[in-house]
Each structure stands twice: as structure tokens, then as C-alpha cells.
């Protein structure tokens, strides 16, 4: 790219500049295509890593200090959605989307479990503020997030990446959402449960 910039200084004619511009655009598109391919490749690898495998066992407390484990939800669909931080804008939006659709999740024989690295006290405040009807689990020892490999270092603190796992009634992971849109994620997961249930 630097060579093209140098050549454009030497090149005086309009035709020469147009040719250099075309070459520059071509190189940019090639780099974009390569990056896009890398993103899709990571997504496919992630699906292969988790789909079809048994979900890891866990035992975590919710916002009311009640314990939850994988085994107690056998026979139900489990939406295990990890989010970075209580009260952050994206996490608030995502939780509200699950709240709105929660009655439909119940009708679909599904339980929604939010998970972050915040503690029980933080979860309690967050849940009360939003009026959440479902459990949010405190993984403040990073036990579950580490099993899924989604702990992210953020300066001196750690957060869970915004990723979700859909677990079928037998305890098998059927989908891994590693790219989440907080506005539409809940609706997407609900649609997938209904699709997989047919």
C-alpha cells in the first residue's frame, strides 16, 4: 500500500492515477474478504467445538441466593446466556428482551438462565431494577465461564464474553451463539427452540 502511495506522487497523468486507485481498492477488498472469511471460520469452529457435546455441570447461586444446577433442568430446554456486566447498556437491553419473551420461553418448555461474573448482591440489584422473572447466576469464581472458555481480561478485571448456549432437554448443546445482537438475540433463541422442537 505504501508503494502505491509513493507511485501516485510520481504518477502525474489522470489515467495513471485511476489505475493506481483501482489497484488500491482491489487490495482493500481482498483484505476485507480475508477478514470476513476469518470471522466465519471462527464461528464454524466454535460450533464444531460445542455442538453435540454434553453441557458442563454447574452449581451456582442466583440473585436470591438460590442454588441452580444443570441436572435440575433435565427434560427442559436451557438458554444459558452469558453477559459481561450488570447494569451496562447492552446487558440491560439483552435482559429486557428475555424478560419480554419469557412467557413464550416457558410455553416452549424452556428455562432462561443469565450468567455473569458479578456477585449475588450485584445480581439482586440488577434483577430488582429490571423486574427480571428468571434467574441470573453469579459465576464470580469464573467456574462456569472458564469451562466454556469465555472469560475475557479487561484491564485489571475479568468479564464473561457475550455468548449463549442452547441446551436441549437431554443436556446436549445444540447451538452456540458467539455473535450476539442484544436487540434480537432473545427472539432468535426462542425461534431456534421452536425449530429444534419440531
Model-found features: residue ranges?
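Thiol-/selenol-based redox modules, centered on thioredoxin-like
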Residues: 159-198
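Structural microenvironment flanking redox-active thiols in thiol-disulfide oxidoreductases
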Residues: 92-132, 143-146
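Short active-site neighborhood of thiol/selenol oxidoreductases, capturing the structured segment around
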Residues: 71-93, 98
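Short loop/turn microsegments at loop-to-beta-strand junctions
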Residues: 55-56, 77, 161-163
Amino acid at each position: 500500500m505504501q508503494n502505491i502511495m509513493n507511485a501516485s506522487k510520481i504518477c502525474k497523468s489522470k489515467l495513471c492515477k485511476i489505475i493506481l486507485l483501482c489497484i488500491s481498492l482491489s487490495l482493500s477488498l481482498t483484505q476485507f474478504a480475508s477478514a470476513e472469511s476469518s470471522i466465519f471460520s471462527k464461528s464454524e469452529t466454535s460450533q464444531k467445538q460445542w455442538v453435540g457435546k454434553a453441557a458442563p455441570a454447574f452449581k451456582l447461586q442466583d440473585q436470591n441466593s438460590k442454588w441452580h444446577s444443570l441436572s435440575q433442568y433435565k427434560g427442559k430446554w436451557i438458554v444459558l446466556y452469558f453477559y459481561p456486566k450488570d447494569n451496562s447498556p447492552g446487558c440491560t437491553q439483552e435482559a429486557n428482551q428475555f424478560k419480554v419473551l419469557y412467557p413464550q420461553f416457558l410455553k416452549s418448555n424452556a428455562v432462561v438462565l443469565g450468567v455473569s461474573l458479578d456477585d449475588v448482591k450485584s445480581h439482586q440489584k440488577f434483577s430488582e431494577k429490571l423486574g427480571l422473572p428468571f434467574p441470573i447466576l453469579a459465576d464470580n469464581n469464573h467456574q462456569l465461564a472458564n469451562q466454556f472458555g469465555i472469560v475475557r481480561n479487561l484491564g485489571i478485571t475479568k468479564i464473561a464474553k457475550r455468548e449463549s448456549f442452547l441446551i436441549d432437554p437431554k443436556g446436549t448443546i445444540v447451538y452456540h451463539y458467539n455473535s450476539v445482537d442484544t436487540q434480537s438475540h432473545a427472539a432468535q433463541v426462542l425461534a431456534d427452540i421452536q425449530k429444534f422442537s419440531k
